């Protein structure tokens, strides 16, 4: 559920992203090992040069598996560790951006994400060098996209 300000962002936690080398194999093994049937087909996010798949861990919280498209060197370093980012849904990206910046989170360029129906998303680098993503979405919007993208 997206939140406006004042945050606690933790209440709007949406997904954790993990980088993988082989998206199809990772989606299949996670879904099978965890007994999770609800997952999306692969979605290309051209602006980030990645392909992603979401697996529902519990209602409203997902594991996003992320695989770099050919030539995407910036994601390659995350393949060593697996963890990539934590994402929160927000109602007002501009206001949330100001709050993140006031807490010394460095904003990276915002982008429209195909995985979120073209809605605006933005990554921030924390003072501890972790990536946090904020995506501006209306309430219930991602669930509708998720259902429409379920893998056969």
Which functions belong to the PLM regions below?
Residues 1-27, 81-88, 140-152:
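N-terminal beta-strand motif that seeds the catalytic metal site of vicinal oxygen chelate
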Residues 2-9, 12-21, 53-58, 63, 74-152:
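Vicinal oxygen chelate
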């Amino acid at each position: 559920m997206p939140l406006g300000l004042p945050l606690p962002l933790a209440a709007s936690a949406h997904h954790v992203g993990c980088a993988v080398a082989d998206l199809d194999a990772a989606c299949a093994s996670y879904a099978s090992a965890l007994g999770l049937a609800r997952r999306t087909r692969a979605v290309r996010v051209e602006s980030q040069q990645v392909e992603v798949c979401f697996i529902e861990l519990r209602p409203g919280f997902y594991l996003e598996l992320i695989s770099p498209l050919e030539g995407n060197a910036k994601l390659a370093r995350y393949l060593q560790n697996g963890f990539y980012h934590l994402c929160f849904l927000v109602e007002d990206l501009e206001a949330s951006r100001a709050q993140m910046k006031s807490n010394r989170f460095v904003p990276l360029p915002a982008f429209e994400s195909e995985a979120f129906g073209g809605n605006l998303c933005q990554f921030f680098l924390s003072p501890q060098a972790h990536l946090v993503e904020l995506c501006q979405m209306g309430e219930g919007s991602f669930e509708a996209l998720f259902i429409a993208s379920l893998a056969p």
